[in-house]
């Protein structure tokens, strides 16, 4: 059970890393005063926080 949970967490972590990278890339195409820039930044911050929480959980395994 623990191995499966760890495997799932690693898969989620990998997916989050890829998604965050894509969001950062998309954000670079926007001007800083564009409302979408702020939305992308908020999403990046939320997903980065989640990714860090998963990293902490993985350290416990």
Regions found by a protein language model. Name each.
Residues 7, 14-61:
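Short, charge-rich amphipathic interface segments used for partner binding and complex assembly
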